[in-house]
A protein has these predicted regions:
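The substrate-binding groove and active-site-proximal loops of carbohydrate-active enzymes
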Residues: 27-32, 68-82, 120-132, 153-162, ...
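Bacterial Sec-dependent N-terminal signal peptides
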Residues: 1-22
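Substrate-binding cleft and catalytic face of glycoside hydrolase catalytic domains
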Residues: 51-67, 83-160
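Glycoside hydrolase catalytic-domain groove-lining segments
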Residues: 79-95, 102, 183, 192-199, ...
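Aromatic-lined carbohydrate-recognition surfaces of secreted/lumenal glycan-active proteins
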Residues: 100-105, 151-155, 159-160, 168-192
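Alpha-helical scaffolding within the catalytic cores
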Residues: 36-41, 133-138, 186-195, 230-233
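Distinct, well-ordered alpha-helical segments
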Residues: 42, 112-113, 162-170, 187-202
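Boundary/entry segment of secreted carbohydrate-active catalytic domains
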Residues: 19-47
Length: 234
């Protein structure tokens, strides 16, 4: 399977080959809100020349001691729910903007999802089963929308590294219901340890690499700061 390298920032830039033509994808993350959207929300995105948008249905773990994932509840904002995702995506599709569905897990009090590692087998199973329900719900939504890309997870290093067999199985289950392109959004210091890149179509990196310790670095200093990271990625 051909693997493409993909960097996720607020602005997502993706290149891929199609019919021998190299097409550049200019993508942005569209933050969910309380309400439905219409042209007045979409037009600013179009003015950035974006032709892809990442839509982010959220889920929550309210107590990491009981790591059950909750999603699509009446406590969420509309844009964070499945119905909100469907409405947002259809509005963007009306103006020929393509869709990546990028589910996000949020831990109460802002804990880092990469550190999520249950301490008992019972809690691991609780996490796995609830994540399965969550990601398959949005894999089915991706199929319903004919979305071009589905991100199967975002910055979940502890989960991924401690339960590799689970992730191999869940990727297979996702592929049974969704036939589009798959990626995973690895944190910048995690990407070279992810064991399942070969099962996906894109290598996703949340590329917040440290580039400079200066308060006001020059463009050249930024470029120099990128060089070692670029070398590691390539």
């Amino acid at each position: 399977m051909k693997i493409y390298k993909l960097s996720f920032l607020l602005l997502i830039i993706l290149q891929f080959s199609c019919n021998s033509q190299v097409k550049k994808i200019n993508g942005l993350s569209f933050v969910a809100s309380r309400d439905s959207i219409d042209a007045k929300h979409i037009n600013p995105a179009l003015r950035t020349n974006s032709n892809y948008v990442a839509l982010m249905p959220y889920s929550f773990i309210r107590n990491i001691e009981i790591p059950k994932i909750e999603f699509n509840t009446n406590r969420e904002w509309f844009g964070e729910s499945k119905n909100g995702l469907l409405q947002y995506a259809k509005e963007f599709q009306k103006v020929d903007v393509k869709i990546m569905i990028k589910p996000h897990l949020w831990l109460r009090r802002g804990g880092f999802t990469g550190d999520l590692k249950p301490t008992t087998e019972e809690n691991w199973i609780l996490l796995e089963n609830s994540y399965r329900d969550y990601i398959l719900t949005y894999a089915k939504a991706a199929t319903e929308l004919n979305a071009e890309i589905l991100c199967i997870g975002t910055e979940l290093e502890g989960f991924v590294m401690n339960r590799p067999i689970y992730w191999q199985k869940i990727i297979k289950e996702i592929k049974e219901v969704y036939k589009g392109k798959l990626t995973y959004a690895a944190n910048w210091n995690e990407f070279n340890r992810i064991p399942f890149w070969g099962e996906l179509d894109f290598i996703g990196i949340d590329a917040y690499f440290p580039l400079s310790e200066k308060k006001s670095p020059t463009i050249q200093e930024f470029e120099n700061g990128w060089k070692p990271h670029k070398k590691d990625i390539i």
